[in-house]
């Protein structure tokens, strides 16, 4: 005999979940509402950063779709193409490249997403849109480069901010928008395991699943479609790992020409630096990408936000978060490796000293 006792319906469970947090980002939601009012009648462009990741593409897709549902004419522009594994998010949408808009006479109000500063979209897009109307971002190093600055460095992802704002304001989140937002949160939290992952992340993720996001689809597209070239690149990266600072820092190097020799490309570097950080006893991991012209790109990761890698990156005109930062040197810099390791050593010493201070 089946019990007549039933639990709450799915609708009631979803309503209860929404009530757990009445408002996710009250000040930013009010600011976004004012932004929408100020943009009435204008054409818009949503711009992301170079080498776009899940949070960047997810933010662009979601924001563009919500703005279109409000009647706006919106396009998305990136300096680089959408990575192969993220193309599922933008199905049915056109993403333009820098050259497509550089000489267009069409005027559009620019909204930058997931960009800590104006230049993250590249110098040419910065020049094409010198006065963005808004920036929506979560980087600790954000410099506040737009009149409407919707920035919260406590958020794990720009998609987290957008999801909260859309829910706060009761804006329409369809299944594709939910998938984009969920994927952005999932990737920037390291599949919900980084220090930035909060209760709010899980509540928002649940709301997005209720609106059509499929975690399994995101997991398959992102983590179960590796190419042979990516695995060859990983092999070279692991073989290059060096331990520094009494084995508390691990650095891997990708030499110039490695993409051609392995049949990989720049998007295949995604996630490699996490292997350097994952070693037991290592506090900081780094990936250095050397270029043929002698310049460098580096990705930095820490296990503890106390190490403030955004400060390390800032020494080289980079930026980011306390646990995840990056830099891109456009000019040849002698002894870059030694200088970077020295900067790591300074942060380790500062954290060690703080832990020994009275009252810690």
Annotate each predicted stretch with a short phrase.
Residues 18-50, 56-87, 102-109, 187-360:
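Hydrophobic helix-and-loop "lid/oligomerization" segment in the mid-to-C-terminal part
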Residues 1-19:
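N-terminal amphipathic/basic-hydrophobic helices that include classical n-h-c signal peptides
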Residues 87-89, 122-123:
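Metal-dependent catalytic neighborhoods of phosphoester/phosphodiester hydrolases
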Residues 94-148:
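Active-site cofactor/cluster-binding pocket
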Residues 102-105, 125-128, 142-143, 173-175, ...:
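Solvent-exposed alpha-helices and their adjacent loops that cap or buttress functional pockets
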Residues 92-95, 129, 151-154, 303-304:
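Short, hinge-like loop/turn segments at secondary-structure boundaries
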């Amino acid at each position: 005999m089946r019990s007549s006792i039933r639990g709450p319906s799915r609708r009631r469970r979803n309503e209860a979940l929404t009530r757990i947090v009445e408002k996710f980002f009250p000040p930013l939601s009010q600011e976004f509402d004012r932004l929408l009012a100020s943009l009435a009648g204008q054409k818009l462009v949503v711009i992301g950063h170079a080498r776009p990741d899940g949070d960047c593409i997810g933010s662009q897709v979601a924001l563009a779709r919500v703005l279109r549902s409000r009647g706006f004419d919106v396009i998305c522009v990136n300096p680089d193409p959408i990575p192969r594994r993220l193309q599922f998010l933008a199905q049915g949408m056109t993403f333009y490249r820098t050259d497509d808009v550089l000489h267009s006479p069409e005027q559009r109000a620019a909204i930058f997403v997931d960009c800590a500063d104006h230049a993250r979209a590249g110098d040419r897009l910065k020049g094409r849109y010198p006065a963005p109307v808004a920036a929506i971002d979560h980087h600790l190093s954000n410099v506040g480069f737009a009149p409407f600055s919707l920035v919260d460095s406590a958020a794990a992802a720009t998609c987290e901010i957008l999801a909260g704002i859309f829910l706060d304001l009761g804006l329409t989140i369809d299944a594709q928008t939910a998938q984009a937002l969920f994927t952005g949160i999932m990737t920037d939290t390291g599949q919900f395991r980084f220090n930035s992952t909060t209760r709010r992340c899980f509540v928002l993720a649940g709301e997005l699943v209720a609106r059509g996001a499929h975690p399994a689809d995101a997991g398959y597209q992102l983590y179960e479609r590796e190419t042979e070239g990516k695995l060859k690149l990983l092999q070279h990266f692991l073989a290059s790992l060096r331990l520094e600072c009494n084995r508390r820092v691990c650095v891997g190097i990708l030499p110039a020409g490695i993409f051609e020799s392995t049949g990989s490309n720049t998007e295949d570097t995604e996630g490699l630096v996490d292997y350097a950080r994952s070693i037991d006893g290592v506090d900081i991991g780094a990936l250095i990408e050397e270029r043929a012209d002698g310049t460098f790109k580096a990705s930095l990761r820490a296990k503890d936000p106390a190490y403030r890698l955004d400060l390390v990156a800032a020494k080289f005109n980079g930026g980011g978060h306390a646990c995840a930062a990056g830099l891109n040197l456009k000019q040849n810099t002698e002894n870059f490796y030694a200088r970077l390791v020295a900067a790591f050593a300074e942060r380790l010493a500062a954290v060690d000293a703080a832990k020994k201070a009275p009252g810690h």
